[in-house]
Structures are given as structure tokens and as C-alpha cells.
Amino acid sequence: MVNEYKRIVLLRGLECINKHYFSLFKSLLARDLNLERDNQEQYTTIQIANMMEEKFPADSGLGKLIAFCEEVPALRKRAEILKKERSEVTGETSLEKNGQEAGPATPTSTTSHMLASERGETSATQEETSTAQAGTSTAQARTSTAQAGTSTAQKRKIMREEETGVKKSKAAKEPDQPPCCEEPTARCQSPILHSSSSASSNIPSAKNQKSQPQNQNIPRGAVLHSEPLTVMVLTATDPFEYESPEHEVKNMLHATVATVSQYFHVKVFNINLKEKFTKKNFIIISNYFESKGILEINETSSVLEAAPDQMIEVPNSIIRNANASPKICDIQKGTSGAVFYGVFTLHKKTVNRKNTIYEIKDGSGSIEVVGSGKWHNINCKEGDKLHLFCFHLKTIDRQPKLVCGEHSFIKISKRGNVPKEPAKEEDHHHGPKQVMVLKVTEPFTYDLKEDKRMFHATVATETEFFRVKVFDTALKSKFIPRNIIAISDYFGCNGFLEIYRASCVSDVNVNPTMVISNTLRQRANATPKISYLFSQARGTFVSGEYLVNKKTERNKFIYYGIGDDTGKMEVVVYGRLTNVRCEPGSKLRLVCFELTSTEDGWQLRSVRHSYMQVINARK
């Protein structure tokens, strides 16, 4: 039973709460678990679950976790789920101790009961309903079952076999299981089957999966999943036409959905379900098929809106992985016939008589996409983004290529105008935002009295760039040029993104590929012309590199005259920046200087977070 408690703590508790609440939970249990304060953020959910099992042997710390969730308004639904799971474990144990028989309407598996209680559509509840309608008591059901030749003890044994996976292994050996000859074994199996049935109440069990005979609507080797699965919709395309093998024109759409532990690509062949496949919508799907790791929903499938108490919490890491595109170098290493999805930059387009070759490119390499039929010579040009859905990897002329198939789809994002100014965001943002580091300063002390330190950085997405203030210098190791990171819980203020804690920045370990155009890089690193600064509003913060042609020291201030081919301006520094030695003829790098004006003209004035560096001193 202790193992059951730990399973609930880990898989239904710690893995389902976000990073902020997990950090809060660790902080509250730091003394009980003897967590080192400096390394508190480093402990993983598995490590914490192991410590809780050792510290609280009675229930593996489940009571502590429930109490914590009840005190946090956003986690109260999670507390109810945990209490329901706990009651199932204690109820099941007492049932076994009393030697009671579990009837067909009383499943002993915690997972299957959670499905029944949360969705109300398991076969067990249906049997209970039909038994009640027939007016048959439990004793009568047992008697009739015994008369049919199956004793209650045998039923109990079968249920135990199902819980331990025996039935799944038997099903794999049945002769009517269609072979998967087109893909390696790992790709033939459903992603759902790769997870333990105890991992989540949302994962269908093997007893409700059936191999289907081949026909015109069901792909060969498809597996039917009749048990309900609760998912959150992440993305969905508009419906589009495709030609079936029978040369009929039909409609479908692609979608991406996620559970608490994994994500799935979905083919939806019933376009009347489009309204349900809306971003961030929670739905319950059943009677769907799985083929080569992709879920398929047709007219016989059930798609229902989830009730408020059936909604799930999808971790940000799952969402990031679902939205990430594979590296092209990894695609090239894939198995022939493998299916790929992703967003890529069009590098070159070659139109042939029967097909079009779209060469896509990222930081790891390039590959050709072969488009024929409706994907022949589509309206796109170099620099556009191609969002590929369901493209097949094939070897043509000894080279791996992505080839369109029956259900392939391409969504085009036109290249927009490259911004000249850094993007501005205001207030608190939870994120995460995935960016590439372009440029970074050295850490410096901006408050000499309290020894406060920071550094500046420039980062970019594929469409815009940002100025960043980082107030935790331990993050310098992550802010390395060309490194791709995810930032969260940051603040937007005066044209800068402000990051205060190390926990707000994480490495992007899954498919860290981002294509930043040369034009965007140039704009992000460019120095604004002085004539352009004359047209800007007072209070604008300026960064750039300028040639110094004059220097004047007056009281506690230093005045530098700077200029370019469009005009001249004055830079005023005071305090700590007066210690930077710079003479006329040198070049100054200015970061975060405020544009202001006096009676004599425009000035760039140093402020609390300004940074100044001499690029090349006069010889």
C-alpha cells in the first residue's frame, strides 16, 4: 500500500503541479526533508518523492501534499483528486482485509475507478446500471456468474492479472494482432501504451484496446481505444480537403492535444468537431484509433466537453515539447516512412513540371520537401515559414527527403517586416518565452553601497528582439551568445524585460533550434543614428556604439561629445561611470542611457542601470 501512496504522490501530485508551486512545496518541507537551501531548486520530483517516502513511511507524505494543495486556491481541485485516490487505496485495502469479493461494478484498480468517478463512462458503471435496471442484486449476479462457469475467485484473479499487465502481454501474442511491417516496433506501438497504466487516470488501459480489421476507413495496424481520455487542445488547423484512396474528396483537420504526461498529434476526420478542437479547450475522447503514434478521430468516435472537475493541468514542459520542431539533422537520421511535423524556414523553392522542391533550413542543416498534387507550387517565397503536418521521410536518389502523403498539410506564415526597434512588453509575464541570446555585457555593480550587481543582454525570437536586464549574475552562464533559453516570470518595464531570479531561466534541451534571420540580427545589434534620436520622445532608452570627439569634466559630471555622419549629441555621466577612462578618439558602447533635452540641446544621460564600455581606446 505504501507503494500506492508513493505512486499517487509522484504521478498524481508532484508531476501535475507547475514549477512555482513545486518550489513553494519544497520550501515548506525543507526542514522536514533536510533540503539544502542553496540547492533547493535542484531537487527533482522523483528525489522529493523518495525523501517523502523515507520521512513519512505511513503514507509517503500524501497527507502533507493534500494539506498543501488545500491551502493553495489554484490547487484545490488537485487536492480533491489526491483525496479521491487515497480513499481508493484505503478502501481497496480494507476490502481485501475483510475478504470481500469485488463484484463487476466494483473495480479494484485505482486507475480504472478514477476513470469511472471522473468521467462516469467505464464499462464497470455501465454493467452496474444494466444490473440495476434489471433489478438483479449483487448476490444474484454472483449466482448467475457462477452458473455460467466463472467463479468469483476466477474473476478476482483475472482482475489482478489485468492490473499487473498480464493481459496486455497476452494480447500482444494473439494471432489476430495485425503486424506492423512499415515501421520499427517502437513506432508501431501507441504512445499511450508506452506509459504505465498507473501513470495517470487519463491513460487508457490495455483491456480496452482492440486491433481492427483492415477496411477503407481504418489504417492497417490501427488500435482502437474505447476508454475515455481527457486531453487539452494545444493547436488545430482549419479544415482542408484531401483525396481518399477511393478518389473521393473529403475534409479533415490536424490537431495537437496533451495529457498531464505526454502529447499527441491527431487527425480529425469529422470536421463537425472543429468547435471542440479549440486552443486550451478540455475534451474527453473515446472510441478513437491510434496508428503509428498518431491518434485518429472519425465519425464513430466520441468527443465530449470536459466538466470543470475533469479538467487537467498540463505541465509547461509538455506544451513546450509539443510546440517544438525537430532539428533537420535529426530528421535526416530518421527511419524511412517516419512521419514528421514542424515549422521550418523556406530557403529555396524549385518548381518542376510534376512537383515542387521546397528546401527548408535550420541551424543544423537543410532538407528537401517534395510537394505534389495540391502542394505543387503553392504560394510561398524564400524566408516564409512552412508549418508541415504529417510529412513522410523517404530516401530518393540516396538522399532523405520529406514527401507529402494523403493527409499532409502545409500552413504558410508569410515573412513580415523585420522590426527596427526592440519589442516592448509591460507588467508581469508568466511565459515561458523561448529566445536566442544575441549579445551580453559583463556583470557590473550598479549600486556601490549595497553591492548590487546585474548585466544587460539582447535576445530574440524568430520575429522580434528584446533588451533584457538580468539581476541575478549567476545566470551569466546561461546567457551565452547563440544559446537558446526559455524565460518565464519576467517583468516588462520601460522597454526592457527584467529577470530577477535564476529559476526564471531554463535551458531548452528538447530540439533547441531557432532560425534568426541576418536582417533581424543586424537590427538588434545596430546603433541608431543621431538624427534618428532627435525624432524620439524624451525618456526613450538608447543603446549603441558612438565615437567620442570631445570630453569635458565639470563638478561631479563628465560630458562626452559624440557624433556620426548625421549629427552630434552630448553624453552625460555621473557617479560610478565617471571612473571609466575614455578619451576623445575612443569608441564608447552605451547601454540603457536615457534620452533627454536641455536648453542647449539633446543629451544621453546615465541612469541607475546604465552600462558603459570603451571599445577601442585612442592610441
From Swiss-Prot:
Coiled coil location: none
Keyword presence, Transcription regulation: yes
Location of region: Disordered: 86-223
Sequence repeats: 134-140, 141-147, 148-154
Domain Pyrin: 1-88
PROSITE patterns: DAPIN, HIN_200
Region (Interaction with ID2): 550-614
Span of the annotated motif Nuclear localization signal: 150-157
Location in or out of the cell: Nucleus; Nucleus, Nucleolus; Cytoplasm
Amino acid composition bias (Low complexity), ranges on this chain: 122-153, 190-206
Record-level GO cellular component terms: cytoplasm; nuclear inclusion body; nuclear speck; nucleolus; nucleoplasm; nucleus
Family matches, as InterPro entries: DAPIN, DEATH-like_dom_sf, HIN-200, HIN200/IF120x, NA-bd_OB-fold
Keyword terms: Acetylation, Activator, Cytoplasm, Developmental protein, DNA-binding, Immunity, Innate immunity, Nucleus, Repeat, Repressor, Transcription, Transcription regulation
Pfam families found in the cross-reference section: HIN (PF02760), PYRIN (PF02758)
Organs and tissues of expression: Present in osteoblasts (at protein level).
GO biological process: activation of innate immune response; cellular response to interferon-alpha; cellular response to interferon-beta; innate immune response; inner ear development; intrinsic apoptotic signaling pathway in response to DNA damage by p53 class mediator; positive regulation of osteoblast differentiation; regulation of transcription by RNA polymerase II
Entry's free-text remark on domains: The 2 HIN-200 domains are able to interact with RUNX2.
Assembly mode: Interacts with UBTF. Interacts with RUNX2. Interacts with ID1, ID2 and ID3. Interacts with STING.
Role according to the record: Interferon-stimulated protein that plays a role in several biological processes including cell differentiation, autophagy and innate immunity. Cooperates with CGAS to sense dsDNA and activates the STING-dependent type I IFN pathway. Mechanistically, gets acetylated upon bacterial infection and then translocates from nucleus into cytoplasm to recruit STING for activation of TBK1-dependent IRF3 nuclear translocation and IFN-beta release. Inhibits the transcription of ribosomal RNA. May inhibit DNA binding by UBTF. Inhibits cell growth via p53/TP53 and RB1-dependent and independent pathways.
Protein name: Interferon-activable protein 204
Species, as recorded: Mus musculus
Gene: Ifi204
